[in-house]
A protein has these predicted regions:
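Cell-envelope/extracellular polymer assembly enzymes that use nucleotide-activated donors
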Residues: 2-6, 34, 188
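Short, well-formed alpha-helical segments that are part of the catalytic scaffolds
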Residues: 12-27
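A conserved acidic beta->alpha catalytic loop
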Residues: 31, 39-48, 68
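Glycine-rich, basic loop-to-helix element that forms the pyrophosphate-binding segment
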Residues: 66-83
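Short aromatic/hydrophobic "clamp" motif used to bind/position activated sugar donors
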Residues: 88
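Conserved donor NDP-sugar-binding/catalytic core segment of glycosyltransferases
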Residues: 100-133
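Conserved nucleotide-sugar donor-binding catalytic segment
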Residues: 148-216, 221
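C-terminal subregions of glycosyltransferases and related glycan-biosynthesis enzymes
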Residues: 204-264
Length: 264
């Protein structure tokens, strides 16, 4: 199996959000891949939608119903436990991708030998394949064989998790994987990585998305994600070497983003 795509799902049935995501995945131009959708105890009919796709695409589509709500990190971990692919990709269940999204990233990986490949993305407020506001997820100078300077740059601005594919060992050899029961788990997580400077991922902005729904719990989770980042820097013995960058990233995540969330 070349690729496993993991989709954490929680209450995305309304307005065809989940359908748009899944349709974009089952229509990918790569052939050797699987889709692992993890329902995180949805209270709408998201699980029923997932079961329909599993029925219609039995050789490609697998549904896991989580016994408890573990947030996106826990759902990702459940999916990873079932993943067979040499490469791992993640997608938010309210977003969608171009039909050749994974083909182009895998092609880039084969040509360069990179452990991780990413791309740019669109910001959009409606379901469409039209070009929206293009966001450059990372800088070209951050790519290639990762030096200390590139690591410093990536700590300060690592970009989004979901617009990348990862060599299996990068994720599965990571002892803590994703923290569970909190939002913003992306902040808690190669030797080389490459960037395809083309927007292939559609990031859907709406009122119920994780980063646009502000609650006390989510602000507390953001702060906990910052603490996790520091704990893991200590665990892997790179806190001292990259202290200024980690301190800056912690301050942004723990204080600045949380403050602006409360003010929004």
């Amino acid at each position: 199996m070349e690729l496993s795509i993991i989709v954490p799902v929680y209450n995305m049935a309304a307005d065809d959000k989940l359908v748009w995501c899944l349709d974009s995945l089952v229509g990918q131009t790569v052939s050797d891949y699987e889709i692992i959708a993890v329902d995180d105890c949805s209270t709408d009919h998201s699980l029923q939608i997932l079961r329909e796709y599993e029925k219609n695409y039995p050789d490609r589509f697998c549904v896991i119903a989580s016994p408890q709500n573990k947030k996106q990190g826990g759902a990702k971990n459940l999916g990873l436990a079932r993943a067979k692919g040499e490469w791992i990709g993640f997608i938010d269940s309210d977003d969608w991708v171009t039909p050749d999204f994974y083909e182009k990233l895998l092609e880039r990986a084969r040509k360069t030998g990179a452990d991780l490949v990413g791309c740019d993305y669109h910001l959009t407020g409606r379901h469409s394949m039209e070009i929206g506001q293009v966001v450059h997820n990372n800088k070209k100078e951050q790519t290639g064989i990762l030096t200390k300077e590139k690591y410093r740059s990536l700590i300060l601005d690592g970009g989004s998790l979901v617009v990348k594919i990862y060599k299996r060992h990068i994720i599965l050899d990571y002892p803590n994987r994703f923290p569970e029961h909190i939002f913003y788990e992306d902040n808690a997580i190669s030797n080389s990585w490459m960037l395809r400077q083309e927007p292939l991922y559609y990031y859907y902005q709406h009122d119920t998305s994780t980063v646009h729904t502000i609650t006390k719990k989510r602000c507390e989770d953001r702060m906990e994600a910052a603490r996790v980042m520091v704990r893991e820097a200590k665990e892997f013995n790179f806190l001292e070497e990259y202290y200024p960058e980690i301190e800056s990233s912690f301050t942004t995540l723990f204080y600045v983003n949380t403050l602006f969330s409360y003010m929004a």
